């Protein structure tokens, strides 16, 4: 973009210079036709004015850039034009360094005018020659999708597969991302790892918070990944996003078509950078692999744990490559770049200015064509060799798959025969099963009806339960009231009993007293002792008898109650 901007700026300056020259020539012709005699009579005055204007414009030109000077085109003279050319060559040194002889002494249309003024002084007219346009590798990569870098964004293009410089096609997802054959979602899995490793299957997932963890002190750290399919592996990407751990430094890759395997085919040794981001590593030569073994040789830093978050494998499987060869054949080798010709309208208008360099450019073009033909021949030969080898590998893999399919087909036929032999028994079993199913359906219907009845009875029971509960609550309230009445009666009964006991004691006392009196009277009478009349009048016997009788009756009533 910078070179294109410089070329456009040089073309603009060249246009401005030609416009100034033409305008100055027109003014000079008109001025010469109308006032030629005036110049002849006052050459000294014109020379002084010319020197003064040259000094003034030279001072002004140092304080303004090309765009500021372009606003005053009508006020420029030939000295300012040469000054502008000098400033242009200082701003664009690449154009002046490559073309050292682009300034020519040429007599133009202004020669006649200046001969009248400066006495046959030749005009130094500078021609700005556009630099040769060289197409860089980045430009070709931007214009031709076959040139793709193996960085993180190298696998994001449109289409089902993508060509790279060595002719390998990458299988892509529908969204344009690379098809990861080491993804757990595609069917890949970890089949083996060292015994100290923890979370080995985490490298196949998308959760960066989970990772493979190994103590850094372990010497043999490895993990064996079974890819989703037998793949022509071309690129492997790894990453470690765990901050408090050591990053992998040197690691090696090896592969095999079967597992377990005693012979692992080396795929390459690589050195990773000490960064917390995904890094891409391209195999020196793509290899057909089903099992990929990753050996972690060394690490950065001195942390206790060495972790690994992501392992991704990109390439193309045999079926995908065959489909690409059948339906999307490449017309040109992927390593042969297309030569881009850059032609603009300004170059067509400047054909007369470049006429002096036509022969030289033609010679360089012929030499470049010869060189390109040699490179093209070498690339075509290399691509044909690689294509033949690649097709041989694809054919080998397809033959292995065909043999495997034949073996599976024979096993399938045996299993079908066994199933046909067992079909009558299976039919009987199916009939029995159908009978049992019908019986079960009838039982289920009966159970459903019984369930409905039970639910109805349960509802009735719930109603009865609520009724009984209300009655029990009323009985409980009556019982509490009755208990209070009983307590009152018990208290009254205790009072009555205490009173009865007092009456009984008093009655017993009087009974004893009356008995003693009557007995003593009879003893005195028996012993002949006389009782005076006065004493009998004071204590008559009939009174004591009444006291004894009443007290006895009270005691008898109390005992009966």
UniProtKB/Swiss-Prot annotation:
<feature type="region of interest" description="Disordered">
    <location>
        <begin position="345"/>
        <end position="367"/>
    </location>
</feature>
<keyword id="KW-0472">Membrane</keyword>
<keyword id="KW-0812">Transmembrane</keyword>
<feature type="transmembrane region" description="Helical">
    <location>
        <begin position="501"/>
        <end position="521"/>
    </location>
</feature>
<protein>
    <recommendedName>
        <fullName>SUN domain-containing protein 5</fullName>
    </recommendedName>
</protein>
<dbReference type="InterPro" id="IPR012919">
    <property type="entry name" value="SUN_dom"/>
</dbReference>
<dbReference type="GO" id="GO:0006997">
    <property type="term" value="P:nucleus organization"/>
</dbReference>
<feature type="transmembrane region" description="Helical">
    <location>
        <begin position="540"/>
        <end position="560"/>
    </location>
</feature>
<feature type="domain" description="SUN">
    <location>
        <begin position="158"/>
        <end position="318"/>
    </location>
</feature>
<comment type="function">
    <text>Encodes a member of the mid-SUN subfamily of SUN-domain proteins. It is involved in early seed development and nuclear morphology. [TAIR].</text>
</comment>
<keyword id="KW-1133">Transmembrane helix</keyword>
<dbReference type="GO" id="GO:0016020">
    <property type="term" value="C:membrane"/>
</dbReference>
<dbReference type="InterPro" id="IPR045120">
    <property type="entry name" value="Suco/Slp1-like"/>
</dbReference>
<comment type="subunit">
    <text>Forms homomers. Interacts with SUN3 and TIK.</text>
</comment>
<feature type="coiled-coil region">
    <location>
        <begin position="454"/>
        <end position="499"/>
    </location>
</feature>
<dbReference type="Pfam" id="PF07738">
    <property type="entry name" value="Sad1_UNC"/>
</dbReference>
<feature type="transmembrane region" description="Helical">
    <location>
        <begin position="36"/>
        <end position="56"/>
    </location>
</feature>
<keyword id="KW-0175">Coiled coil</keyword>
<dbReference type="InterPro" id="IPR008979">
    <property type="entry name" value="Galactose-bd-like_sf"/>
</dbReference>
């Amino acid at each position: 973009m910078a070179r294109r901007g410089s070329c456009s700026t040089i073309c603009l300056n060249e246009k401005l210079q030609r416009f100034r020259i033409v305008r100055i020539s027109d003014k000079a012709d008109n001025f010469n036709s109308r006032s030629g005699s005036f110049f002849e009579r006052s050459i000294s005055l014109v020379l002084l004015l010319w020197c003064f204007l040259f000094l003034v414009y030279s001072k002004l030109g140092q304080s303004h850039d090309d765009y500021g000077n372009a606003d005053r085109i009508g006020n420029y003279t030939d000295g300012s034009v040469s000054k502008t050319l000098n400033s242009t060559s200082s701003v664009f040194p690449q154009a002046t360094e490559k073309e050292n002889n682009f300034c020519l002494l040429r007599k133009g249309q202004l020669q006649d005018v200046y001969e009248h003024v400066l006495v046959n002084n030749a005009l130094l007219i500078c021609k700005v020659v556009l630099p040769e346009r060289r197409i860089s590798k980045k430009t070709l990569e931007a214009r031709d999708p076959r040139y793709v870098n193996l960085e993180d964004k190298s696998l994001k293009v449109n289409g089902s597969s993508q060509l790279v410089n060595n002719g390998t096609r990458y299988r892509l997802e529908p969204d344009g991302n690379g098809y990861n054959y080491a993804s757990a979602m595609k069917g890949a899995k970890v089949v083996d790892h060292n015994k100290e490793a923890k979370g080995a299957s985490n490298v196949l997932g998308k959760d960066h918070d989970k990772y493979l963890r190994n103590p850094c002190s372990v010497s043999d750290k490895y993990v064996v990944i079974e890819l989703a399919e037998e793949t022509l592996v071309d690129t492997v990407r790894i990453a470690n996003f765990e901050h408090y751990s050591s990053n992998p430094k040197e690691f090696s890759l090896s592969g095999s078509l079967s597992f377990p395997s005693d012979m692992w085919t080396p795929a390459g040794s690589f050195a990773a950078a000490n960064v917390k981001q995904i890094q891409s590593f391209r195999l020196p030569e793509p290899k057909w692999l089903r099992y990929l073994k990753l050996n972690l040789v060394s690490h950065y830093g001195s942390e206790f744990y060495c972790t690994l978050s992501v392992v991704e494998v990109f390439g193309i499987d045999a079926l995908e490559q065959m489909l690409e060869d059948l339906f999307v054949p490449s017309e040109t080798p992927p390593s042969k770049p297309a030569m881009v010709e850059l032609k603009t309208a300004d170059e067509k208008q400047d054909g007369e200015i470049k006429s002096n360099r036509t022969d030289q450019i033609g010679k360089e073009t012929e030499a470049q064509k010869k060189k390109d033909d040699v490179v093209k021949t070498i690339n075509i030969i290399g691509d044909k060799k690689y294509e033949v080898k690649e097709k041989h590998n694809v054919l080998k893999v397809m033959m292995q798959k065909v043999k495997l399919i034949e073996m599976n087909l024979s096993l399938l036929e045996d299993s079908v025969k066994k199933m046909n032999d067992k079909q009558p028994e299976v039919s009987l079993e199916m009939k029995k099963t159908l009978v049992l199913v019908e019986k079960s359906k009838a039982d289920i219907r009966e159970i459903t009806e019984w369930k409905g009845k039970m639910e109805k009875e349960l509802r009735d029971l719930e109603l009865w339960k609520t009724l009984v509960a209300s009655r029990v609550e009323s009985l409980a309230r009556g019982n509490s009231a009755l208990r209070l009445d009983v307590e009152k009666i018990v208290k009254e009964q205790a009072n009555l009993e205490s009173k009865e006991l007092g009456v009984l004691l008093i009655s017993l006392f009087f009974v004893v007293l009356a008995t003693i009196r009557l007995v003593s009277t009879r003893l005195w009478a028996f012993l002949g002792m006389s009782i005076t009349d006065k004493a009998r009048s004071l204590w008559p016997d009939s009174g004591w008898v009444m006291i004894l009788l009443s007290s006895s009756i009270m005691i008898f009533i109390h005992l009966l109650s």
